[in-house]
Amino acid sequence: MRAVVILLMSALVAACAGSGEPRERDRFEEMAVYERHAGGAESWVRYTSIRNWWAVGFNSVVFEMGRSRFYLVELIGACDLDLDSAMTLKVVSGRRNVIGEFDDVIVNGRTCQVQSIRRLDYEAVKAELEDEGESLPDKHDNVDVETQDASSGGT
């Protein structure tokens, strides 16, 4: 009887371990999917609003700007340590309604700089993730935008 109980418990543990969420995509694999569907780098992008954002890989975010305009934004700096756990972020730009290279993104008090911005074919990303049985990322809508005075202050 004891052997049967142990066997059943082992089977139950194995079943629980194998069920539930689909396997989590490795961050490098995840980033590769997004990079395959991203266009060439742009120096800056004009937007009306940043509707949503989510972290991708180790040091990138996707911004949904307006309706169905998505951009893969690669960051450099310490903020990437908090991207996965952040619920909000702040974009600090030198021009109103424009995000560009060298602008800042602040996550939990840590500042990163925008290294590159690339237009993203999100429908293709979504299709590839769904084909592989992967879940879509959780989107966050908490984005603060600050425009700093870019004037030189000179004569």
Residue ranges and their predicted role:
Residues 12-15:
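C-terminal motif of bacterial Sec signal peptides marking the signal peptidase cleavage site
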Residues 5, 50-52, 106:
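Residues embedded in well-ordered secondary-structure elements
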Residues 1-9:
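Sec-dependent signal peptide recognition
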Residues 17-77, 81-82, 140-152:
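N-terminal secretory signal peptides
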Residues 8, 57, 121:
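Residues that line or immediately flank small-molecule/substrate-binding pockets and catalytic motifs
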Residues 77-155:
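Helix-rich interaction surfaces within compact, conserved domain-sized segments
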Residues 9, 43-46, 110:
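Extracytoplasmic/secreted proteins and extracellular or luminal domains
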